[in-house]
C-alpha cells in the first residue's frame, strides 16, 4: 500500500485518567493505554499494512504507543524517529493541574476557549495555531517526502498535535477543527494521490 499515512493518538496515559492537563509533561501509559496500542498494532497488521518509517514525539506515552504497534506488526527493528515538533500542545501554566479545578478557578467558558479555540493560548502555553506552526513544517520537510515516494508512514503523537496536522491535511478552517476529536489508540489511515491530495481516509476501530 503506497503513499499511506497512519496517525494515532497515544494510548490512555496516567494523567488522562487523573483528569490533568498534560501538555509537555511526560506521564506513562496506563494498563488500558498499553492494551489500546497493542490492539492498534494487531489491527494494522490485519489490515495488511507494513511501515517503511515511523515518527513519534519526544514524550514517552507516544513513543511507547509506537513501539507496541511496531512490535505487534513484527517491525520492532524499524527506526523510530523522535522529535519534539510532534509533541502535544504546551498547556503552559495549566500543565499538571486538574481540569475540574481549573474550571472552578477560571470558569467553564474561559477553559473551553483555551482548550478548543484555534488562536487563544492558555497562560504561557500554546494555542492550536502555535502547535500547527511547528507540526506542519516538520511534516512537510521530513514526513511528506516519504509518502510521496510511495512509502507507508506511522505517526504516533498527541490529540492536539495530530488535530493541527489534520487541519492542514484536510484544509479545515478554525471552526471545523473545533469539533474534531481523536480517541486514544485508534488509528486513522490516509492514502494520497501523487499530487499529495487525499485519496481516502479510514478509521480502524477495535
Curated annotation (Swiss-Prot):
Keywords: Gluconeogenesis, Glycolysis, Isomerase. One of its GO terms (biological process) is gluconeogenesis. Substrate binds at residues 9-16, 22-23, 61, 88-91, 99, 115-116, 159-160. InterPro entries: His_Pase_superF_clade-1, His_PPase_superfam, PG/BPGM_mutase_AS, Phosphogly_mut1. It is an enzyme of class 5 (isomerase). The record marks 158 as: Transition state stabilizer. SMART domains: PGAM. Its EC number is 5.4.2.11. The active site is at 10 (tele-phosphohistidine intermediate), 88 (proton donor/acceptor). One of its GO terms (molecular function) is phosphoglycerate mutase activity. Pathway: Carbohydrate degradation; glycolysis; pyruvate from D-glyceraldehyde 3-phosphate: step 3/5. Disulfide bonds: none annotated. It catalyses: (2R)-2-phosphoglycerate = (2R)-3-phosphoglycerate. Catalyzes the interconversion of 2-phosphoglycerate and 3-phosphoglycerate. Belongs to the phosphoglycerate mutase family. BPG-dependent PGAM subfamily. Homodimer. This is 2,3-bisphosphoglycerate-dependent phosphoglycerate mutase. It comes from Bartonella quintana (strain Toulouse) (Rochalimaea quintana).
Amino acid at each position: 500500500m503506497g503513499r499511506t499515512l497512519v496517525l494515532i493518538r497515544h494510548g490512555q496515559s496516567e494523567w488522562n485518567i487523573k483528569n490533568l492537563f498534560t501538555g509537555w509533561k511526560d506521564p506513562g501509559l496506563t494498563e488500558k493505554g498499553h492494551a489500546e496500542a497493542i490492539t492498534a498494532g494487531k489491527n494494522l497488521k490485519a489490515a495488511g499494512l507494513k511501515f517503511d518509517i515511523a515518527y513519534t514525539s519526544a514524550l514517552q506515552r507516544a513513543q511507547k504507543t509506537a513501539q507496541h504497534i511496531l512490535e505487534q506488526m513484527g517491525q520492532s527493528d524499524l527506526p523510530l524517529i523522535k522529535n519534539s515538533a510532534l509533541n502535544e500542545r504546551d498547556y503552559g501554566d495549566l500543565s499538571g493541574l486538574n481540569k475540574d479545578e481549573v474550571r472552578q478557578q477560571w470558569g467553564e467558558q474561559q477553559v473551553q476557549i483555551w482548550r478548543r479555540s484555534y488562536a487563544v493560548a492558555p497562560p504561557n502555553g500554546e494555542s492550536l495555531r502555535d502547535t500547527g506552526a511547528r507540526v506542519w513544517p516538520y511534516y512537510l520537510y521530513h514526513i511528506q517526502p516519504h509518502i510521496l515516494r510511495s512509502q507507508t508512514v506511522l505517526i504516533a503523537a498527541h490529540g492536539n498535535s495530530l488535530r493541527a496536522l489534520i487541519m492542514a491535511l484536510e484544509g479545515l478552517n478554525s471552526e471545523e477543527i473545533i469539533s474534531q476529536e481523536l480517541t486514544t489508540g485508534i488509528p486513522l489511515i490516509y492514502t494520497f494521490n501523487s499530487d499529495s491530495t487525499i485519496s481516502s481516509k479510514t478509521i480502524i476501530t477495535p
